[in-house]
Curated annotation (Swiss-Prot):
GO terms for molecular function: metalloendopeptidase activity. Its main location: membrane. One of its GO terms (biological process) is cell adhesion. It is found in: Cell membrane. Residues 1-55 form the signal peptide. The lineage of its organism: Eukaryota, Metazoa, Chordata, Craniata, Vertebrata. This is Disintegrin and metalloproteinase domain-containing protein 23. The gene is Adam23. Can bind to LGI1 and LGI4. SUPFAM superfamilies: Blood coagulation inhibitor (disintegrin) (SSF57552), Metalloproteases ('zincins'), catalytic domain (SSF55486). InterPro entries: ADAM_Cys-rich, Disintegrin_dom, Disintegrin_dom_sf, EGF-like_dom, EGF_extracell, MetalloPept_cat_dom_sf, Peptidase_M12B, Peptidase_M12B_N.
Amino acid sequence: MKPPGSISRRPTLTGCSLPGASCGPGRCPAGPVPARAPPCRLLLVLLLLPALATSSRPRARGAAAPSAPHWNETAEKTLGVLADEDNTLQQNSSSRNTSYSSAVQKEITLPSRLVYYINQDSESPYHVLDTKARHQQKHNKAVHLAQASFQIEAFGSKFILDLTLNNGLLSSDYVEIHYEDGKQMYSKGGEHCYYHGSIRGVKDSRVALSTCNGLHGMFEDDTFVYMIEPLELTDDEKSTGRPHIIQKTLAGQYSKQMKNLSTDGSDQWPLLPELQWLRRRKRAVNPSRGVFEEMKYLELMIVNDHKTYKKHRSSHAHTNNFAKSVVNLVDSIYKEQLNTRVVLVAVETWTEKDHIDITINPVQMLHDFSKYRQRIKQHADAVHLISRVTFHYKRSSLSYFGGVCSRIRGVGVNEYGLPMAVAQVLSQSLAQNLGIQWEPSSRKPKCECIESWGGCIMEETGVSHSRKFSKCSILEYRDFLQRGGGACLFNRPTKLFEPTECGNGYVEAGEECDCGFHVECYGVCCKKCSLSNGAHCSDGPCCNNTSCLFQSRGYECRDAVNSCDITEYCTGDSGQCPPNLHKQDGYSCNQNQGRCYNGECKTRDNQCQYIWGTKAAGSDKFCYEKLNTEGTEKGNCGKDGDRWIPCSKHDVFCGFLLCTNLTRAPRIGQLQGEIIPTSFYHQGRVIDCSGAHVVLDDDTDVGYVEDGTPCGPSMMCLDRKCLQIQALNMSSCPLDSRGKVCSGHGVCSNEATCICDFTWAGTDCSIRDPVRNPNPPKDEGPKGPSATNLIIGSIAGAILVAAIVLGGTGWGFKNVKKRRFDPTQQGPI
C-alpha cells in the first residue's frame, strides 16, 4: 500500500484540485478529473472576493486610501490561470493519484510586507511586496533589501516570515547569457531577490523565497510545507493586493530520522552499520573534521531551453529569475542536510532556438547536452538543462551518476514545472551527480525515511514535494566523498556577487572574518566581522579555537580518504585548509594491485564489491583470458549492433567484468537481462567467472571494467583498451637529476603540481625546509617569579628590615635617655 501523497514514480510538476472547490458529495470522481466544472471555478472566485474586498493598505497619517483592485479584472485573471492549470492537469493526470490530491490543500491569500511607519514602534502590513531598496542611483542594477519580513494569512493561521538575502547563492563571477542574432550576449550580475529565513516564533522552521515579481517559494514548520506563488506575473511590481495561491502539504518528521539509527547491516547494503556516524557531535577543541563535515560548494550553471523562455513571456529576465528561484530552493535543502552550498555561477537562456534536439528520450538528450556542455566556456562543477518537455520515462530528470567535476559527465536534464517541483527534480539529478542512488521501495525500511505523507527525495515513488534526504542518501554521499569523488567541491568562494554584508558567512572586502547566520566560527575570535584583538583567525580546520591563532605548519587538517588522496596540512599562515587535491592518474595503490584514476583506487576487486557487495571479488585471470577473447555474451569487449566484439589478447582485462560471489541483485543500477553464471575447473579447483550487464539511468553499463583499472605493468584501461600510462599524455611534474618525480620528497597532484612533504619546499620539493615547531607549545602551567622580580623583592625586603631595626633602635635610645635623667625611674643598685 502506498503512503498517502505518493504518486507513481514521476513527481507532479503542476497544481492540484482545491479542497474548497469540490463538486459536491458523489458528483466528482475519486481521482483527478480531466477538467474542473464551471461551478468549481465560480466557487473559487467567490472565495477570493471577500479577501480582495477587505484588503487595505496601511497608510501614514493623512494619506488617501488606495483604490482596491477591480474584482472583475481579478476574477478574469484567476479564471485564466485556472484554465491553464486545468489544461496542464489534464495532460499530467496519469501521474497523480487520489491519496495525493486529498493530502494537498490550496487557498488564495493576499500577502503583505511588514514595514515601520513614522512615529510607530510596531510593524504594519503593507500590500506592496517589492523589496527593492530606495535611492539606488549609484547602482546599475536593482538592489534588494538585506532583510525583510512578510505576513501571510492562510488556513486559519497567520505566518510572519523573517528573511535575509541569500548572498551565498550567486558567485562573484556570476554571468547571464542569452542570444541575439545568433551571437551570445553576456551580462554580469542580475537582479538578486532570493531570501532564506524562518517563521517568526517557530523553532527549526525554514523559508526559501524570491521576491522578484511577487512571492515565489516555500516555507515549512514541523508539520506542514507551504508553497506560494502569484496567480499571475505582472510588470507592475508596485501594484497592491496581489493575490497569491498557497498550497499546504504534510511535512515529514526528519528530525526523527537522525535518532535511533539502525546498526543492522547486510551484505547488500554494507554501509548501513556505519549510520551511527551520522549523529551530530559537540565540537571539541579542533576536532578532526572529515570531508563530509567540511562545508562544500557546488558551482552550478543552469541552461533554459527555448520553450522555457517562451513560457516566461519571452523575457530572459523572467526566465533567469525563475532559474535563480529554483536554485535558491535547492541550496536551502543541500546546505541543511549535505553540508553543501549550491552556488549559481551562470544562467544561459536559449532565446532564439534550441541548441540541441529536445526530445522525449532523456537518454539521448543527456548525451547531446553533454556534447554541448563541452563547448561552454564558463567554469562549473555541474551544468543542468531545464526543458519544457515531458519525457517518455519513469522520472522527470536524468544525469550521469557520480559525474560532478567532469566536463563530460557533470551534466543533467530536467523537466520544467512549478518552482518547488523543479527544485525537487533538480535536487534529484544533482544528487545523482554526487553519487547518491535512487531508492527503490525495498530499501525504505532500512533507510528509515518516515515522511508522514510521502517519502524522501530519492525515493522512486515520485513524491511531489519532499525536501528531505534519507539517511541512506546522506551515507552514500559521504561514501562518494570518502572514495575520492567531488574533489572540486572544496574551493570556497572568497567573495560574493552582492555588496559586503556582515553575517553571510563569506569574508569580503572590508571584513576580517564572518561567522555567518549559522555560527560556524569561534565566537571569542570574531566580533562584528572583525578579528578580536590578538586573534589571527576565527574559523577553519587550521585555526585554534582557543587561542584564535593559526595552527602551526605541518598540522594535519584533512585526512587522505584513500591511498590515491593527498593529506592536506596547514600552511601556518591561514585558518583554512589548502585545496583538496588527489594524486595524479597512474600512481599505484592498494599494495601495487591498483592504479589511481580520478582520485579513486581502481581494481577489479573494488569494482566487483561496489556492484555486488563486500563478499564479491574479481575473478581469476584465467576467466578473462578465456572468455573475453570469445566474443560471446559470457565475455566480450562490447557490442556492435547485434554482434559481440571479442577482445584482443592485449585487452582482455579491459572487457566484460567477471566476478565471484555475485548477489541476486546489484547494489547499483538495474540488471539488463540476467546474471550469466560461468565456472571452470582450473588447476585443481573450481573458479567462478560470472558477469552481468548492469545499466545505470544514463545508459552506462557498469558491467565492463572501469577506465583506470590496471591491465598490465605500467598499463591501465581506457575505453576498453589496455594502454601504456605514458600514452595518456598527462602533464608531468618536475623531475630531479635522478629522474625522481618531485625529487622523491612529494607527490604529483591532479593539477600537475608537486605537493611536498611538509619538511620540503619548492616547485620540485628540492629545498629542505624543516618544521621548526610542528606542535603547538604545551601549557607549562604557572611560571615562577623572574630574576628581576626576585632582585626587586630582595631590595624591598632589606629596606623594610632596615627600617624596622632603625626604628626599634631609636625607640630604645629614647627610653634610655629618659631613665638616665629621671630619678624616680632608677631602681636599686
